[in-house]
């Protein structure tokens, strides 16, 4: 079973993803709240995260700039943790392009659009 830290700004989406991951039987999900002085790298280390799933949006705390700083810190602290970004390719195509570029540049291990099915998302995460 993989430990997955879920850091998603939208509470409803976060809860739905956590429920989906729990129900798959392949993950032990942990929700990390977005707070001004939080340190996701420390949280991931404390929770022995195998995967960190982050959303990227225009909202404060979830911007691409913020998320790239966070993934850099996690990569330095826990090099084996897989870094995964989730974004909405329809409402934020510019963010989606930035996320694709982050993957191309090796800054993250994978990305998903929020339009994917839950079956695909769980299967792809399990394969990391």
Regions found by a protein language model. Name each.
Residues 11-37:
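Two-component/phosphorelay signaling modules centered on CheY-like receiver
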Residues 52-77, 90, 95-98:
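Conserved phosphotransfer microenvironments
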Residues 34-51, 61:
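Acidic, metal-coordinating helix/loop segments flanking the phosphotransfer/catalytic sites
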Residues 45-47, 74-80:
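Conserved phosphotransfer cores of two-component systems
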